[in-house]
Amino acid sequence: VWGDVPLFIEPTEKYSEAIYKERTDKNYIIDNVILPDLKKAESLINRNKNYERKRISICGVWAIMADVYMWTEQYNLADQTIDKMADIKSSKGRLVDFEPSIQTWHTMFTEELNNKPSDDTPENDEYSTKEFIFLIHFNMDEVGTNGYSYMYQWFSGSGNRAAVLSDKLMSVFNEPDMQGDLRKAYTVKDYQNGNELRKYMAGDISNSLNKTCEVAYPIYRYTDMLLLQAEARARLGKWEEALDLVKKVRDRAGLVTPTALSFASEDEVINYILRERQVELVGEGRRWFDLLRTGKWKEVMKPINGMSQDGNELF
């Protein structure tokens, strides 16, 4: 988001000139602060108690760690870290897993994320779907009238249409190999000549404009990890293994996946995986950071909004 930033590793209890620091190189922060923090968390977290998805579990630690490894181009480590998740068990079996049903994929956003109570029992997992790894919990006592039940009116609850899907995304849905994508009907709502994000909507836009509900927001889920792992394996030259992971996701969406022979270069495979992430994870805050991480933000954004100068990508 910011690139190089000032580094503080001790609390600041009062004002002094010492709070003004020069920026520290982002790679130093990743290597010497973020990754050591994650490895410490990995060693300390209770793997037999922390199952709740609105708190960090060991799989949540690994999800962040794998994400960091992808940013630092340590693809073997990202691949190995994601593999670890399959071994974590709770009383209900695997803690995280792939959800093969498109109907359940839909209801996990519209029902599973809605109206979960706050509690202090990390060993109690309220979620029936294992897709979610970590999410931000919403409590009605804390947020009040948020209008969050429909993402397009999130900011005011009065129909500001804050999450309108772009024409670029809609053109992806219209590509030949995306015809019949079962996710489209659950992702897009044509409303007042615009394409609204309906991923988190259980009903229709017009029947409850100011409805407020307690909806958690997914930060990491297992399909996100599988597609990251596909990208890592593609970077390692394992194209078939990468596409096998993509196939699981596209099978659920009712789509066909090509074989490795259909691609002429690693970059083609990577772009194919990134497009799948764009569609699968729409509304989950992933696309922009995928473009930054892979260095593709200029080629993608310049035709859309003219972004092309180094520094434009940072706040």
Where are these regions (language model features)?
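Short, cationic low-complexity segments
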Residues: 154-183
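Active-site-adjacent substrate-recognition loops and nearby beta-strands
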Residues: 146-155
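Acidic/polar-rich alpha-helix caps and helix-coil junctions
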Residues: 1-146, 176-315
